[in-house]
Amino acid sequence: MAQYSQTLRSSGFTSTVGLTDIEGAKTVARRIFENYDKGRKGRIENTDCVPMITEAYKSFNSFFAPSSDDIKAYHRVLDRNGDGIVTYQDIEELCIRYLTGTTVQRTIVTEEKVKKSSKPKYNPEVEAKLDVARRLFKRYDKDGSGQLQDDEIAGLLKDTYAEMGMSNFTPTKEDVKIWLQMADTNSDGSVSLEEYEDLIIKSLQKAGIRVEKQSLVF
């Protein structure tokens, strides 16, 4: 967390007492997010954390080359709600917490509880299929960003078909493109675990399988 405080200082924010009001903290958050959200993706990925860390150390005339473990750990610190994605809201919460002493954690926890409670309850057979999907997703989410890019999807597709007994299937670039278009519901150019799970559920439903509450019905 000390590294993050250094990042705040290196972003250009100054204060004689080291504190500001909530609006001031939001201004700092916006400045940090816009500076490090390379490509305007709407999120900060592991690769974006590298300059955040190195520039923080540089502001103290120190050189530091973060390892992959350092980068992943830093990303987890920024990811306040633990969904695998660092958004502007995550950065804003950190800025408010450490620049004003005000915490918004309770609100975020409440929102997470609402999100979890509204998630459909699937029967055990479907949950077993989703567990396999989650395991495959984690295997190919090589940078731990919680998102799959083009170069990570081909392997996921191959293993998904293998789980269905089609071990000889090798996806083409066109297959990957079509699958990405189907799965990427928010059109951000990548596929999240939630989007992948939704696609699995829709595929089961199209196959005539009842996915909620009752046992599988073919």
Curated annotation (Swiss-Prot):
Xref: Pfam families: EF-hand_7 (PF13499)
Amino-acid positions noted as binding Ca(2+) 1 in the UniProt annotation, renumbered to this chain: 37, 43, 48
UniProt-listed GO biological process terms: cell projection organization; regulation of cytosolic calcium ion concentration
SUPFAM superfamilies assigned: EF-hand
Protein name listed in UniProt: 25 kDa calcium-binding protein
Residues reported to bind Ca(2+) 2: 79, 81, 83, 90
Every EF-hand domain range: 24-59, 66-101, 128-163, 171-206
InterPro entries in the cross-refs: Calbindin_Ca-bind, EF-hand-dom_pair, EF_Hand_1_Ca_BS, EF_hand_dom
This protein's UniProt keywords: Calcium, Cilium biogenesis/degradation, Cleavage on pair of basic residues, Metal-binding, Repeat
Purpose: Expected to play a crucial role in calcium-dependent regulation of ciliary movement.
Miscellaneous field: The 10 kDa protein binds one calcium ion.
Organism: Tetrahymena thermophila
CDD domains: EFh (cd00051)
